[in-house]
Swiss-Prot record:
Binding, ATP: 206, 297, 328, 354-357
Xref: InterPro entries: Phosphoglycerate_kinase, Phosphoglycerate_kinase_CS, Phosphoglycerate_kinase_N, Phosphoglycerate_kinase_sf
GO biological process: gluconeogenesis; glycolytic process
One GO CC term on file: cytosol
Entry keyword set: ATP-binding, Cytoplasm, Glycolysis, Kinase, Nucleotide-binding, Transferase
UniProt: substrate binding residues: 22-24, 38, 61-64, 120, 153
Superkingdom assignment: Bacteria
Protein name: Phosphoglycerate kinase
Catalytic activity of the protein: (2R)-3-phosphoglycerate + ATP = (2R)-3-phospho-glyceroyl phosphate + ADP
Pathway(s) served: Carbohydrate degradation; glycolysis; pyruvate from D-glyceraldehyde 3-phosphate: step 2/5
């Protein structure tokens, strides 16, 4: 971890600091924030800057606006929530690099906070545009990246902006350091037995991570929609369940590689099946060998939960990424929720990655019991895959 430039090593005294945060929070149709975990996660870095007499400019994206300003993607609500959490004013700019932002930034005094409007209202943000990055860099003498959730994206406020700062004036915030730490320790020195639990709908999104995890884990549990491609590769009849036909050979290859490495791989033994994904559809609990034709598995069944619980019993480290079923609908969420309970009961070091998985853990009431809940899905997967992330690379110390 010492190879990453850290905020605690910088001389911040009374400087203006630009912090790239990840305030990409879920909202309901009335634009109320339904989960403010990402906002709360940014507070230690913000407070540290304020304690050093800094003035602070915060920048983030929210959602994926198509072209320019859209009310539902405004960060105004985030500024209000942050103000409440910090118990101090957060000044809000109605644009990103326009006159409102510039005027408010130049009037900023020590101890004051300004939040810019959604970075993605500027089309240059996602294009990693250096002109936009240069404009953003004018907002701070110091650049801090605390947005792990976007570190796998080469965007203007994440990568291009770092070119405007030398090593004395840029660093990772506390949240980013914590994220990198957990991911690196997981890969390099997990306490064993190390069990990876991988779910979610698609094998394609997790293929590289599975290949990278196999030599490092002791056991691998595969659930969610992606399990059906593995079951199909073993010759099971999976009915209408989700299948990535073109990845059957890859699935077979992973199972074979697991066997060669002595890694035990566990797949669901039963499922909750329905004819369609709807609240009205009748459901059946069936073994994976007996999914009726025209029916699809939408969650793991009770026997799978029992099996996976036994597999986890002696775990010392658990990494979980991806739900066990289509948890958005109550009747198909039980497997994921029971999995969450089972992981918490292990008393192992438990690391949860990915937005959906974090939602499951929150819903199960287990969030406080997990060792660490990562704020980034794609980013944590890419770190596990062993990739260098565009947002982290410029924050590595030059000498190493």
């Amino acid at each position: 971890m010492s190879d990453i430039l850290s905020i605690s090593e910088l001389n911040l005294a009374k400087k203006r600091v630009f912090i790239r945060c990840d305030f990409n929070v879920p909202m309901d149709e009335f634009l109320n924030i339904t989960d403010d975990r990402r906002i709360r996660s940014a507070i230690p870095t913000i407070r540290y800057c304020l304690d050093n007499g800094c003035s602070v400019v915060l920048a983030s994206h929210l959602g994926r606006p198509k072209s320019g300003f859209e009310e539902k993607f405004s960060l105004k609500g985030v500024a209000k929530r942050l103000s409440r959490l910090l118990d101090r004013d957060v000044i809000f700019a109605n644009d990103v690099i326009g006159s409102d932002a510039q005027n408010k930034a130049s009037a900023l005094k020590s101890g004051e906070i300004l939040m810019l409007e959604n970075l993605r209202f500027e089309k240059g943000e996602t294009k990693n545009d250096e002109i936009l990055a240069g404009e953003l860099a004018k907002f701070g003498e110091i650049y801090i990246n605390d947005a792990f959730g976007v570190c796998h994206r080469a965007h203007a406020s994440v990568e291009a902006i770092t070119k405007f700062y030398d090593d004395e004036h840029k660093a990772a915030g506390f949240l980013l350091q914590k994220e990198i730490n957990f991911a690196q320790n997981l890969i390099k020195k997990p306490t064993r037995p190390f069990v990876a639990v991988v779910g979610g709908s698609k094998v394609s999104g997790k293929l590289q991570a599975l290949h990278n995890l196999l030599p490092r884990v002791d056991k691998l549990i595969i659930g969610g929609g992606m399990a059906f491609t593995f079951l199909k590769s073993l010759g099971e009849n999976i009915g209408n369940s989700l299948l990535e036909e073109e990845l059957i050979d890859d699935a077979r290859e992973i199972l074979k590689k697991g066997k060669e490495l002595g890694v035990k791989i566990y797949l669901p033994v039963d499922v909750v099946a329905a004819q369609s994904f709807s609240a009205e559809s009748a459901v059946k609990y069936v073994t994976v060998q007996e999914i009726p034709s025209g029916w699809m598995g939408l969650d793991i069944g009770p026997a799978s939960v029992r099996l996976f619980k036994e597999v986890l019993a002696d775990a010392q480290t658990v990494w979980w990424n991806g739900p066990m079923g289509v948890f958005e609908m109550d009747k198909f969420s039980k497997g994921s929720i029971k999995m969450s309970h089972a992981i918490v009961e292990t008393h192992a070091t438990t690391v949860v990655g990915g937005g959906d998985t974090a939602d499951v853990v929150e819903r199960a009431g287990d969030a406080d019991e997990m060792t660490f809940i990562s704020t980034g899905g794609g980013a944590s997967l890419e770190l596990i895959e062993g990739k260098e992330l565009p947002g982290i690379k410029p924050l590595r110390k030059a000498s190493e």
